[in-house]
């Protein structure tokens, strides 16, 4: 790398950082008084109130499907998959809940499929299909509502890496496919990628869980200069699962490291410092590359901390894309263009950067990405309900006729058919 090239990068970055730092405090303060309006219909959708637009009936399942799992291993409450737990708790006291199933628009089955953890705290999805099948068998035998639609008016929260494909490696997730019993149900999931077998039409893509209280505790003064140009902490290689280094993240993270490990504009490392949240608030751009799956909590953290997300995940379907203007607040870089990332970011007009920061300062934008306890207006819980409300009324044909083809209860891998 020539010294003239490095000098040009540093000069360009210095201009951006100086302008962003000077304007960041002003943008944050302005956001508190007068946030920039989100353009188009997205702003209206983001602030929709779902109350009065739908009613949800919650099945009363035996505790072994939910609460006992958390009691056995409370670490589930802090995992990035914890949305399935907090969604259940939210709905129990929500104004959209109905105790009369005959007036319900939607039926919710509170089954926790991500609470089987290793000693290291990693979720094991291998029992998840059996847990889900068992829960569906239970509701189909105890109530008549599943059988009249084969689940078409039911929704399930499935926050696994690849949703209801229930595997953390893409190749095996594709091989498994979505659990056959969920083919007609609406899936609320973190995984989103266009034209992928693990994302069926009509699914609602949501953010992963990131602990709101923990992030709140690490807030720094809003007028703190953003003195870091590009920031990332995480794996570049997963040597345990991908010794060759070409499959993990489709090689995008390896490319990041090989191209920019010595670039002074890029603060990237595998180290995860105690100042991680503070550092994101000091950065202009936060890298959000795919890992095994296209999504990660970094996306939530970047939005909450006002750091422009640089999304490196081809064909990703982002959370609440009909409400959050991702194209306006983020930067999209194709995986093949990672080697050009320095040029892409240093070439961005300063006015574009400042506008993205002003939009990110909008409190509604941040709130939509979070699952706070207790729930708050316009948070991720309410965005999920808005998504369900927009699917109403259910289309013709939701109620099955005697001549209609029913779901095959014996479809899928033999191991999934074992009793749980």
Curated annotation (Swiss-Prot):
It is an enzyme of class 2 (transferase). It comes from the Eukaryota. One of its GO terms (biological process) is protein glycosylation. The keyword DNA repair does not apply. InterPro entries: Exostosin, Exostosin_GT47. It is a single-pass type II membrane protein. It holds the Pfam family Exostosin_GT47. Signal peptide: none annotated. The chain crosses the membrane at residues 5-25. Keywords: Cell wall biogenesis/degradation, Glycoprotein, Glycosyltransferase, Golgi apparatus, Membrane, Signal-anchor, Transferase, Transmembrane, Transmembrane helix. Its main location: Golgi. Coiled coil: none annotated. Its EC number is 2.4.-.-. Belongs to the glycosyltransferase 47 family. PANTHER family: EXOSTOSIN HEPARAN SULFATE GLYCOSYLTRANSFERASE -RELATED, GLUCURONOSYLTRANSFERASE OS04G0398600-RELATED. This is Probable glucuronosyltransferase Os04g0398600. It comes from Oryza sativa subsp. japonica (Rice). The lineage of its organism: Eukaryota, Viridiplantae, Streptophyta, Embryophyta, Tracheophyta.
């Amino acid at each position: 790398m020539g010294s003239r090239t490095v000098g040009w990068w540093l000069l360009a970055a210095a201009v951006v950082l100086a302008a962003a730092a000077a304007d960041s405090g002003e943008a944050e303060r302005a956001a508190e008084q007068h946030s920039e309006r989100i353009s188009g219909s997205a702003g209206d959708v983001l602030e929709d109130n779902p109350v009065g637009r739908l009613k949800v009936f919650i099945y009363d399942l035996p505790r072994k499907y939910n609460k006992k799992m958390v009691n056995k291993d409370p670490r589930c409450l802090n995992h990035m998959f914890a949305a399935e737990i907090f969604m259940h708790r939210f709905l129990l006291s929500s104004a959209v809940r109905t105790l009369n199933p005959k007036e319900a628009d939607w039926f919710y089955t509170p089954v926790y499929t991500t609470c089987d953890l290793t000693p290291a705290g990693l979720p094991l999805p291998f029992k998840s299909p059996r847990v889900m099948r068992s829960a569906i068998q239970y509701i189909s035998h105890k109530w008549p509502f599943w059988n009249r639609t084969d689940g078409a008016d039911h929704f399930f929260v499935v926050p696994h890496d690849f949703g209801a494909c229930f595997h953390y490696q893409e190749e095996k997730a594709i091989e498994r496919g979505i659990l056959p019993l969920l083919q007609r149900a609406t899936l609320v999931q973190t995984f989103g990628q266009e034209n992928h077998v693990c994302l069926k039409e009509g699914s609602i893509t949501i953010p992963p869980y990131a602990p709101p209280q923990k992030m709140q505790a690490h807030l720094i003064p809003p007028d703190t200069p953003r003195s870091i140009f590009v920031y990332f902490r995480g794996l570049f290689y997963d040597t345990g699962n991908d010794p060759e280094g070409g499959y993990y993240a489709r090689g995008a993270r390896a490319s990041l490291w090989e191209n920019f490990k010595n670039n002074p504009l890029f603060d990237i490392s595998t180290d995860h410092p105690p100042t991680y949240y503070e550092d994101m608030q000091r950065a202009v751009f936060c890298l959000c590359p795919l890992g095994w799956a296209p999504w990660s909590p970094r996306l939530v953290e970047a939005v909450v901390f006002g750091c422009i997300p640089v999304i490196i995940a081809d064909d990703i379907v982002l959370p609440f894309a009909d409400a959050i203007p991702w194209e306006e607040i983020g930067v999209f870089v194709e995986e093949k263009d990672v080697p050009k990332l320095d040029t892409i970011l240093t070439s961005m007009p300063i006015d574009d950067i400042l506008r993205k920061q002003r939009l990110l300062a909008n409190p509604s934008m941040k709130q939509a990405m979070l699952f706070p306890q207790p729930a708050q207006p316009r948070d991720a819980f309410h965005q999920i309900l808005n998504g369900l409300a927009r699917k109403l009324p259910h289309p013709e044909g939701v109620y099955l006729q005697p001549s209609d083809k029913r779901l095959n209860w014996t479809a899928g891998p033999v191991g999934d058919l074992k009793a749980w």
